[in-house]
Amino acid sequence: MEFRPFDVQLAVAFRGLTSRSGVLIKGVTRDGADAWGEYSPFPDYSPSQRNRWWHAAMEAAHGDWPAPVRDEVAVSSIVPDVPVNQVAELAAAGGCRTVKVKVGGYSSMLQDAHRVEAAAAALGPGGKVRVDANGSWDVDDAVRCLTELELAARRGGLDGLEYVEQPCRTIDELAQLRRRVDTPIAADESIRIPEDPMEVVRAGAADILVLKVAPLGGVHACMRIAEQTELPIVVSSALDTSVGLMAGIALARALPSLPYACGLGTGALFATDTVRTTLVPRDGVLRAQPWDVTV
């Protein structure tokens, strides 16, 4: 196997990050073809968290992925905490018809509402806006903020929000919130070990599960989780480079059902990448592409 360290720059600061670093692992499939995995856990991760990222990277480096049931994957664009005048371009990037707007961070509630409204207006009729609070609200704040953001989406010309991702930090808070709002709730940060999804389901804490390949230990680990629940799955990125995104695409292509656009459009956030041609959506979809690693 071959190991190549990388450090790539983001075009837009994302949750305080301006770059991503890690190691690419080059391996060989059973058929003798090259395969690549990405190991890029965040600096504050624990040894057990890092081990799952390592397992996912080694799985990818052996090309050990399930057979696909679809050729292409509908994805969402992403709007981080940026000024409202940058929202329209980011929201409509790559022809996406769904956008995820980051909320509850450094911006005020009013700024979040302006960005949601601008994103909705940029997509127009038939577009979908989801928001992601990364667990930044308590239950009462979430009720108040979601009321305002639902109104903002309607001012932008849509029927409301598609869903809210991880509005509160704990599973118990998500369950409480779900009983108080009509906005569908997707669990993301609450799902970081294979046992988490069933705890979310048992608590009645979510309508949708967000699965990320690297944090959960690989594509096959995610497939096993999906088999255990009847809740719809959204495959999302852990701010991977294009090499890591290929694992997300492999999962999304293999799932029997994929009713929502996946959160795999994050390649658009990178100024530099680990491949020659960054994986970004075209006409709102991603397709697997040949490896063209440049690091």
Predicted regions and their residues:
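N-terminal capping/lid subdomain adjacent to the active-site entrance of alpha/beta enzymes
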Residues: 1-130, 134-143, 147-155, 258, ...
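Short helix/strand-capping turn motifs
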Residues: 257-268
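Conserved beta-strand termini and adjacent loop/short-helix elements that scaffold enzyme active sites
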Residues: 6-8, 78, 188, 236, ...
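A structural signal for the main folded, soluble domain(s) of proteins
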Residues: 62, 67, 74, 183, ...
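Catalytic core of soluble alpha/beta enzymes
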Residues: 103-246, 250-252, 269-281
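Residue-level detector of functional hotspots within protein domains
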Residues: 61, 87, 195, 229, ...
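Short linear motifs at secondary-structure transitions and domain/linker junctions
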Residues: 1-4, 51-55, 160-161, 184-185, ...
